[in-house]
């Protein structure tokens, strides 16, 4: 009797010997519910994947980031199966997992209705309960075309094989550069193919492994993101590892809806988006303008203290500048069309960096001037597609707090350390404190330019700077800008959502393109390194993040109105006007409500406007030179001397405390 062939694998850091034909699931002793897939040599694989000699195997748990992505991708397949069973004429687009959920696009005659979603969700529950198995099989391009002959969008993806991920957002989950694969949903008893889809996987073992899901909404979406293509109907859903996790997520969404900056912007009279201006273009009202002004002034002061020099650049430039910078060859789709003027093409600027390079190049530079830190509140314009424009967080015109630092290679490590500390400290001053860092690097994509060695050096320096902050560091392979690696500061808000805030990017390419030089100590001409940095990302987006973080109740130093005087009767108005005058002398933003409304309504109005302090005054207060001091949360101290009340207000503002 011949011996069973054996394989040597590494499992949880330990070498093991297993029989040939052993699957990842068998090696992991996976239950298919908690451990739902495997990492084999760093690549996610189904539990049914047969192992080879030398494989390194790790578990993927359903409550991990990778595990949730697999869960959501599998749920997208169940969604598509349910739709095609209920709407047989529906043609399939793509259905990837996304942050906190998934979607699938369908070509159907009519948009889906809320009643349709209920029917689809019910059918999904039936499919899940049935326990259909996800089964992977490799197919030739020819066989895939034959099997999917009635799916025109899938056929298009097959023709784009190898470039599908670049051609259509989310298409990378279906078609890669290698052999095509199809996933069948198999009946648990008969093995009959219930449904199939072009897909790279991996997937859950079976549909019963989907613990909790919900369909959320529908939207229109152009195929491959182009308005020249057919408009499809997109169904969004979410899926989680437990029913409690789903409930927590839905509760968070309810709270997020209350904090939606677009809603609060109207309620608090901060900003608006007039139709006459066009999509993605905001106007700030006086109260919003005050908040923005305070944000900018504090940032400006901190930058001046940190050695930055302020500059200003125009909103428009001839095309040649953006050819030199590389933005037209690499970024043209995100720029507005050119304006023809005096025989030349002019573009609204999408980036400030090319103009800062011109400032650097305007005269000879010495090593003694470096690092040179240029800073600007520069307004830029980007052609965001209508489907992704979202209030202030994704606008077409916005102002960046944009800095570009020119330094020597030797100065770069210290400069990045200093810069990252400065960025985090300043964000903390605005009330954000829960951070992690993301390091975006290059991959094998041809979009990345420059020498690999320079990329490696810059990436390692960024990594070391990030590690010194003692924050979690997450790697993002392939997520860098085309010209250099970057660190992104990710911040959690009051309800646990993550926002990308500041970005710090190293750039060896722009100094070459613009032939930037400095005279070194030995008299030679050397090329500086350029560091791009936007601390807020944009003023508008940061405004929106803070508005939602504080649910409109800005800390006193940022509040558009910091104090409101509320007289008990009209004869108390002059007394409060005098208190207001004294506060204004200290720069406090104060109003007196002299309207005919009753006192309780005035208090309610101040609470609705989320004003931090209310000063109430009646006969007793006037006689004692005092006020009733009421906080935003409703707590109140009576008979507070005016001087003490003023000092309390000034202290809270000076210390940037929340009340």
UniProtKB/Swiss-Prot annotation:
One of its GO terms (biological process) is threonyl-tRNA aminoacylation. Residues 1-61 form the TGS domain. The keyword Cytoplasm applies. Binds 1 zinc ion per subunit. Its main location: cytoplasm. The keyword Cytoplasm applies. It is found in: Cytoplasm. One of its GO terms (cellular component) is cytoplasm. It is an enzyme of class 6 (ligase). It holds the Pfam family tRNA-synt_2b. Its cofactor is Zn(2+). Residues 260-555 are annotated as: Catalytic. Keywords: Aminoacyl-tRNA synthetase, ATP-binding, Cytoplasm, Ligase, Metal-binding, Nucleotide-binding, Protein biosynthesis, RNA-binding, tRNA-binding, Zinc. Its EC number is 6.1.1.3. Zn(2+) binds at residues 353, 404, 532. It catalyses: tRNA(Thr) + L-threonine + ATP = L-threonyl-tRNA(Thr) + AMP + diphosphate + H(+). CDD domains: TGS_ThrRS, ThrRS_anticodon, ThrRS_core. GO terms for molecular function: ATP binding; metal ion binding; threonine-tRNA ligase activity; tRNA binding. Belongs to the class-II aminoacyl-tRNA synthetase family. Catalyzes the attachment of threonine to tRNA(Thr) in a two-step reaction: L-threonine is first activated by ATP to form Thr-AMP and then transferred to the acceptor end of tRNA(Thr). Also edits incorrectly charged L-seryl-tRNA(Thr). Homodimer. This is Threonine--tRNA ligase.
